[in-house]
A protein has these predicted regions:
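Low-complexity, acidic Ser/Thr/Pro-rich "mucin-like" tracts of secreted and single-pass surface proteins
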Residues: 569-587
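Non-catalytic, solvent-exposed segments at the cell envelope interface
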Residues: 2, 7-9, 13-19, 28-570, ...
Length: 587
């Protein structure tokens, strides 16, 4: 072969090699583009699946079948993203500035999303296996501490997840990242609080500990809860739990008064709450203040001091009964279907033994509440469902807990079971002063309106309509008049109070000069006036106040009433009995 032929062949070979490399590069670009497009498409699918489930930990913990199927779809989409971007052929893409950022983001999101789902799934296995351990007194404390440790571990794992780059992402990846970030934040809160609660409950049950147990009846309302008509104790130690017999709370009235510990409660309600009569407590929706006073009254005549108090009402009992099944009591079978009607009205219709015995009627809830609470610790309960269903009970103020132990009280506050108010609260309470059982027939509707007044203040107007729908023919014990009462039969007499943010000024009630209560109430301010509403009639009470523009959010606090109070915001009615935060700018 001549030198010219050799040179030609070498040139041809070099051209072929170059062309081949260019072809390979083009094919690789097509392949990488396809894999990247597939990954972005899968990310879009994951985003859609995330939208459908909203990564609600509550449904996750409850084991909802449809939710499980949706989560499986999210997991599948995230795994498809990961597989599309894996392998040695995709490695070079990671160094390309913009494209590489998308690849690194999609890979990190798929990996973190799958890990997050795995963490919660693993925890659910532990929770499912915890049921038998919670039934046995000798295993209860250890089981709760194991749950606390597992939730703490899940919290640590979630906190370590890396979602990859945050800036300059494709819209699909940016949206998936936002959703996953929000879900992880919620998960971190859930695991942190869950771990704290499991640990504190374990410590309580390890004991020795003693709490007052109060049974509140929503047929006769106080501020933020029903009136505590019966009381007993929950005594715990070494994992065992004993719920003592409950007696009418008025039997615990004192011969001499106990000082009201909370200064605002004393200043606002000292004229009515005398420190002796249990039925005259509970005038403020700030449960920590009224609870501390109740425990002080209880301990004034007890040899063994209670650390705190737990208050449950028929709605809390209904939730427990859904999980434990019915209980047999001296008044018959009580289950989740009949407990509300029974205690709010049915028990007063002559359905109880001893129809003429008012003491028996008054104490009927006391016969049931200990049985239901005791069964909570012995029945075979789905722990995940318990976690799920107690959420609304807590949010609706149907389960309230206070402890004199400041560390333990801090946990109750974090869980939302403390009944505390904050400086953004709006709470409307209707306190029964009949005394009768007409709250079951009384509706509360509050419309909120906001008008901006310059750059510094907004004027807020609360228009509350109270309607007495008591039917004719109710027993005297329900509609009155009670002996010694000035309230006519079928009429509702009470005090309607409004707790508003502490920063509010110029708080007033239209056409009312002589207020029943006015002034600071913890982080809020309160005003109130008496109302007398005849059967079939309504009363309208209008409150106005100026709110500094620095207050940007309001928390609508539920009252635990039934019928549930209605809030009207922007013409839209909201009636779920749950706490809600609203933006002042949207009112």
């Amino acid at each position: 072969m001549t030198s010219s032929q050799v040179g030609g062949w070498q040139g041809f070979s070099r051209r072929n090699v170059v062309n081949f490399l260019i072809l390979v590069l083009l094919l690789w670009c097509v392949f990488a583009g396809y894999r990247l497009t597939r990954a972005v498409s899968a990310a879009s699918d994951a985003r859609g699946a995330l939208d459908s489930v909203d990564l609600d930990y509550r449904a996750w913990m409850a084991g909802d079948d449809q939710f499980d199927a949706d989560i499986a779809s999210v997991r599948s989409s995230l795994e498809k993203v990961h597989s599309s971007l894996s392998g040695p052929l995709m490695a070079p893409v990671r160094i390309v500035p913009f494209v590489g950022r998308q690849v690194r983001s999609a890979d990190a999101l798929s990996e973190s999303g799958s890990q997050m789902i795995g963490v919660v799934d693993d925890l659910l296995v532990v929770i499912d296996e915890a049921g038998p351990g919670l039934q046995a007194a000798d295993k209860r404390v250890a089981t709760l501490r194991l749950l606390a440790a597992q939730m703490a571990e899940a919290h640590a794992t979630l906190g370590s997840l890396d979602l990859g780059p945050e800036e300059n992402l494709l819209s699909q990846l940016r949206e998936v990242r936002t959703d996953l970030s929000d879900a992880i934040e919620e998960g971190l809160h859930t695991m942190e609080v869950g771990s704290e609660v499991a640990g504190e409950v374990a410590a309580l049950l390890d004991g020795p500990s003693r709490y007052v147990l109060g049974a509140a009846n929503n047929a006769e309302m106080r501020a933020g809860s029903g009136l505590v008509l019966s009381a007993g104790e929950i005594v715990a130690g070494s994992g065992g739990v004993l719920v003592t017999e409950m007696t009418p709370s008025w039997t615990r009235n004192l011969g001499s008064p106990v000082a009201i510990p909370d200064a605002d409660l004393r200043s606002r309600w000292g004229w009515l709450t005398d420190g002796q009569n249990w039925l005259l407590n509970w005038m403020s929706p700030r449960f920590p203040a009224t609870a501390e006073h109740a425990v002080a009254m209880w301990n004034a005549q007890s040899d063994q001091l209670a650390e705190g108090i737990v208050v449950v009402d028929p709605f809390a009992l209904r939730t427990i009964l859904r999980l434990t099944g019915p209980v047999e009591t001296s008044i018959g079978t009580v289950d989740a279907q009949n407990v509300i009607e029974l205690f709010l009205n049915g028990q007063y219709q002559g359905s109880l033994p001893g129809t003429g015995d008012q003491v028996l009627r008054r104490d009927s809830l006391a016969d049931v509440a200990p049985n239901v609470v005791q069964k909570l610790f012995t029945a075979d309960i789905d722990v995940a469902r318990l976690f799920d269903q107690l959420r609304d009970v807590v949010d609706g103020r149907h389960l309230l807990i206070w402890s004199a132990d400041t560390d333990r009280q801090r946990v109750w506050e974090r869980v939302g079971v403390s009944g505390a108010l904050d400086d953004r609260t709006i709470a409307v309470s209707l306190i029964n002063r009949g005394p009768n059982k007409l709250d079951y027939f009384t509706n509360l509707r509050t419309e909120i309106a906001v008008v901006r007044e310059g750059d510094r203040f907004a004027t807020v107007t609360l228009t509350t309509t109270i309607t007495n729908r008591t039917p004719v023919g109710q027993p005297q014990y329900v509609e009155g008049p009670v002996q010694g009462s000035i309230t006519p039969a079928g009429a509702y007499r009470g005090i309607v109070t409004f707790n508003v943010p502490g920063a509010a000024i110029n708080v007033s009630i239209d056409d009312v000069d002589d207020l029943s209560v006015a002034g600071p109430d913890g982080p809020t301010r309160v005003v109130g006036t008496e109302v007398l509403i005849e059967r079939g009639s309504s009363a309208v009470v209008i409150v106005r106040f100026d709110l500094p523009n620095r207050v940007t959010e309001l928390t609508l606090e539920p009252s635990a009433r039934f019928p549930i109070e209605t809030w009207v915001i922007g013409g839209e009615s909201r009636r779920d009995g749950l706490s809600e935060t609203v933006l002042v700018s949207e009112l």
